[in-house]
């Protein structure tokens, strides 16, 4: 299991478009569980409506947890996604 912390820096936070892109990326890792947590709430990254329910805004601190056989690849791609989009 791997994880990383990230502070959202995008003024729009994780809006619908960015959440959709993240969900699409997470769905590529069918055998790996990717979870995004904000405070005491968490959602699987491949579930769009649950991710939107986290209401991630600019300045929020999130924790991304990756568990499965493709966790190293997923970690690299997800970290790049967050740095490029959020």
Predicted regions and their residues:
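Amphipathic, hydrophobic secondary-structure cores in small proteins
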Residues: 43-55
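Compact, glycine-rich, soluble single-domain proteins
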Residues: 9-44
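Short glycine-rich, polar/acidic loop-and-turn segments at beta strand-coil junctions
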Residues: 40, 49, 66-68
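Short amphipathic
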Residues: 1-10
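C-terminal structural segments of small proteins and small subunits
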Residues: 7, 53-86
